Amino acid sequence: MALEQNQSTDYYYEENEMNGTYDYSQYELICIKEDVREFAKVFLPVFLTIVFVIGLAGNSMVVAIYAYYKKQRTKTDVYILNLAVADLLLLFTLPFWAVNAVHGWVLGKIMCKITSALYTLNFVSGMQFLACISIDRYVAVTKVPSQSGVGKPCWIICFCVWMAAILLSIPQLVFYTVNDNARCIPIFPRYLGTSMKALIQMLEICIGFVVPFLIMGVCYFITARTLMKMPNIKISRPLKVLLTVVIVFIVTQLPYNIVKFCRAIDIIYSLITSCNMSKRMDIAIQVTESIALFHSCLNPILYVFMGASFKNYVMKVAKKYGSWRRQRQSVEEFPFDSEGPTEPTSTFSI
């Protein structure tokens, strides 16, 4: 779901009052959330800017190298390329949410729907491509290596991942809108029961976290066990990489999905019974979802830059860029005394 932290609004605890995905019909007071909004105005722009800059640099390099330099690709390469594209599209939505936290939504209702849908689509597809990578690594270690390379099944899997993410982003296209306070939030119609709203939350948790986490956990566990049984193979580094991947996934994704699960349960059973509890829930969503977004910065490091082959491609790019820079500098070099003898001189650059 598109940045849920931006849904922090004042709401009235009266019967029939609907605000975003929340329905606090048991409340009898007014909860003023100005302090939550002030926290978001400071925290979100800073954190999202850091994520955007780091993630854009890393994932852009991954896409560029796979697109222009690495022509011979494996299935894992295809999944990593799709993961980097998903992360980039996700990152491109972050400036809009940073502005939304400070100034409100200024781009209109249509852009609110599109940006929210893109956010969910790429967040979910990224998690699913992580699961695909774990399956391919499991097959590579435990099965007989295949010489067929990237085949039709690989592209079918990628298509299915994107379609599943698109389907899960449809609620964002339908329900997200700009409210009276100029905030891009989901507003559900009154005829839509609390069970349906909770179901949407649970689907996001299951497809975007639980299923990928279970697949990654099982595949990497079997892969690690297989590596430890292999004779005459140095396994310390592969095991460290696998362990790092799992730990980073848990640390970045588990807190956010726990908070989402608590909120889904609250939608049905109205567990939040005070204004302070509601504020703490809003801040928890802001912080945990921001941490979850940071995973898009770490994906290039975890899945690409740790590989020796990709490092070689990076070195080739660096050498080519260095050679280009040297050639350009040599063209720009000229002696300060144009009539004097030719000799090495200082370069002049802007």
Swiss-Prot record:
Intervals, Extracellular compartment: 1-42, 109-113, 176-201, 262-289
Disulfide bonds, paired cysteine numbers: C112-C184
Tissues showing expression: Predominantly expressed in heart. Lower expression in lung, pancreas, spleen, colon, skeletal muscle and small intestine.
PROSITE patterns hit by this protein: G_PROTEIN_RECEP_F1_1, G_PROTEIN_RECEP_F1_2
Main localization (coarse): other
Xref: Gene3D superfamilies: Rhodopsin 7-helix transmembrane proteins
Keywords assigned by UniProt, alphabetized: Cell membrane, Disulfide bond, Endosome, G-protein coupled receptor, Glycoprotein, Membrane, Phosphoprotein, Receptor, Transducer, Transmembrane, Transmembrane helix
Modifications made to the protein after synthesis: The Ser/Thr residues in the C-terminal cytoplasmic tail may be phosphorylated.
Membrane topology annotation: Multi-pass membrane protein
Protein location: Early endosome; Recycling endosome; Cell membrane
Residue ranges, Cytoplasmic side: 64-87, 135-154, 223-240, 311-350
One example of a Gene Ontology biological process annotation: immune response
TM regions (residue ranges): 43-63, 88-108, 114-134, 155-175, 202-222, 241-261, 290-310
GO MF annotation terms: C-C chemokine binding; C-C chemokine receptor activity; chemokine receptor activity; scavenger receptor activity
GO cellular component: a single term: recycling endosome
Residues with glycosylation annotation: N6, N19
Assembly mode: Forms heteromers with CXCR3. Interacts with ARRB1 and ARRB2.
Function as written in the Swiss-Prot or TrEMBL entry: Atypical chemokine receptor that controls chemokine levels and localization via high-affinity chemokine binding that is uncoupled from classic ligand-driven signal transduction cascades, resulting instead in chemokine sequestration, degradation, or transcytosis. Also known as interceptor (internalizing receptor) or chemokine-scavenging receptor or chemokine decoy receptor. Acts as a receptor for chemokines CCL2, CCL8, CCL13, CCL19, CCL21 and CCL25.
Membership in a protein family: Belongs to the G-protein coupled receptor 1 family. Atypical chemokine receptor subfamily.
Protein name as annotated: Atypical chemokine receptor 4
Gene this chain is encoded by: ACKR4
